[in-house]
Design a protein with these regions (language model features):
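NAD(P)-dinucleotide binding in Rossmann-like oxidoreductases
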Residues: 201-265, 275-278
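C-terminal helix-rich "cap/oligomerization" subdomain common to oxidoreductases
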Residues: 30, 58, 66-68, 115, ...
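A contiguous active-site-proximal alpha/beta segment in oxidoreductase catalytic domains
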Residues: 97-149
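N-terminal Rossmann-like dinucleotide-binding module
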Residues: 1-46, 268
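Residue-level detector of anion-binding/catalytic polar loops
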Residues: 27, 89, 116
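Hydrophobic residues in well-ordered beta-strands that form the structural core
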Residues: 12, 92, 117-119
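Rossmann-like dinucleotide-binding domain that binds NAD(P)(H)
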Residues: 148-216
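Beta-loop-alpha module in the N-terminal Rossmann-like domain of NAD(P)-dependent dehydrogenases
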Residues: 45-91, 95-105
Length: 301
C-alpha cells in the first residue's frame, strides 16, 4: 500500500511518522517543499530517495492509496482538494480548513467522489477519553489551557479549541439542544473561551484559557455519584468515595496515549478493506467551532 505524508512538521515527525514507518506492507512516501527537512526526516525513517518528493505533482504521480496531510492549515483546501479529485483516501490533521465554506466543500467533494476523508480527532481514540464513554456523563467538564498565548480568535478556535469542541460532542450522551459561548477578547486576541452545551439531563462545558499560568488538559465526567478525571491524557483518577489513580505505563508510547496510533491504524485498515469513511460528523464539529468564532468576535467588537 502506497501512503504519502504531506508536510513534515513537528506533529508529523513526533507522532505520525514513527507509527507509519513501523507498519508492515506500507510503502511510505514523504513530501515537503523544504529539501533539508525532507532529507533529514527521510534518513531517520530509512525512506529511499525515489520516495522523497519536494512537490505534490511528483507525489501524486506515484499512484497513492492513501495520504496523510500535515501541512499548514492555510494550504489544506488546495492539497486535500487535489487528493480527493484523483481518488486518494485522505487523512487530514484538524481542522479541515479555517473557513467553514472550504470545509463543507471538501466534505461534499469526498462524498461526490466516494473517497474517504478522515479528520485527525485523535482524542476520540485516546484510551483515557474513549473509556469515558462507559462512565456516567451527566456533567462533562474539559479544560485545555496554555501559558501566555492569546491568539486570533479563528486561529485559536480552529487550530486548538476544536479538540475541546469535538471531545465534548463525542462524549455527550444525547442530542445537544442548547449552545452558549462566552469569551474574552483584548486587542483583537482571544484570551479565553467557554462553551456550554446542554441537552436532556446533561451539561457539557469546555474551557480554554490562553493566560492560565499552566499548560494542562483536564477532562472530568461525572454522574450518579461517581466521577472520572483524565489528566493530560495520561493519568486516570476514579472518584467513588476514595480516589483511585491509574497512571500511564512508563513504556506506553505517547502516540498511543494520545490516540494517534489508534486513529492511524483504523484509517489504514479502512483503506485496506475498501471502506469509505465520511467526514460528515467531523464537519459538525467545524460548524460548532464557527458558532464559537462568531460569538467571541461579536463579544469582542
Amino acid at each position: 500500500m502506497k501512503v504519502g505524508c504531506i508536510g513534515l512538521g513537528d506533529i508529523a515527525q513526533k507522532a505520525y511518522l514513527p507509527v507509519l514507518a513501523a507498519q508492515p506492507g506500507v510503502e511510505l512516501h514523504l513530501q515537503t517543499r523544504t529539501p533539508a527537512t525532507l532529507e533529514r526526516v527521510a534518513a531517520v525513517h530509512h525512506v529511499p530517495g525515489e520516495r522523497r518528493h519536494t512537490d505534490l505533482d511528483s507525489l501524486l504521480a506515484q499512484g497513492l492509496d492513501a495520504a496523510f496531510v500535515h501541512a499548514p492549515t492555510a494550504v489544506h483546501p488546495e492539497i486535500v482538494g487535489r487528493l480527493l479529485e484523483v481518488g486518494v483516501a485522505t487523512y487530514v490533521d484538524k481542522p479541515i480548513a479555517y473557513e467553514l465554506a472550504d470545509s463543507e466543500r471538501l466534505v461534499d467533494l469526498a462524498e461526490e467522489r466516494n473517497v474517504s476523508l478522515a479528520v485527525g480527532f485523535n482524542r476520540r481514540h485516546a484510551p483515557g477519553y474513549a473509556q469515558c464513554v462507559e462512565h456516567p456523563r451527566e456533567l462533562i467538564l474539559m479544560q485545555k489551557n496554555r501559558v501566555g498565548l492569546p491568539e486570533d480568535p479563528r486561529t485559536m478556535v480552529l487550530d486548538d479549541f476544536i479538540h475541546v469542541v469535538d471531545t465534548l460532542r463525542f462524549l455527550v450522551p444525547g442530542q445537544i439542544d442548547d449552545v452558549s459561548v462566552r469569551g474574552r477578547v483584548e486587542n483583537g486576541l482571544l484570551e479565553h473561551v467557554v462553551l456550554q452545551l446542554g441537552g436532556a439531563g446533561f451539561t457539557a462545558i469546555g474551557v480554554m484559557n490562553r493566560l492560565s499560568g499552566s499548560t494542562e488538559e483536564v477532562l472530568e465526567v461525572s454522574g450518579q455519584d461517581t466521577k472520572r478525571q483524565v489528566l493530560n491524557l495520561a493519568d486516570v483518577v476514579d472518584h467513588k468515595g476514595q480516589p483511585t489513580v491509574r497512571r500511564r505505563g512508563d513504556w506506553v508510547p505517547v502516540a498511543r496515549q494520545r490516540g494517534i496510533e489508534q486513529v492511524v491504524l483504523a484509517f489504514l485498515d479502512s483503506v485496506r478493506a475498501g471502506k469509505v469513511l465520511s467526514a460528515r460528523d467531523a464537519l459538525a464539529s467545524h460548524e460548532l467551532c464557527e458558532r464559537v468564532v462568531r460569538a467571541v468576535q461579536e463579544q469582542g467588537a
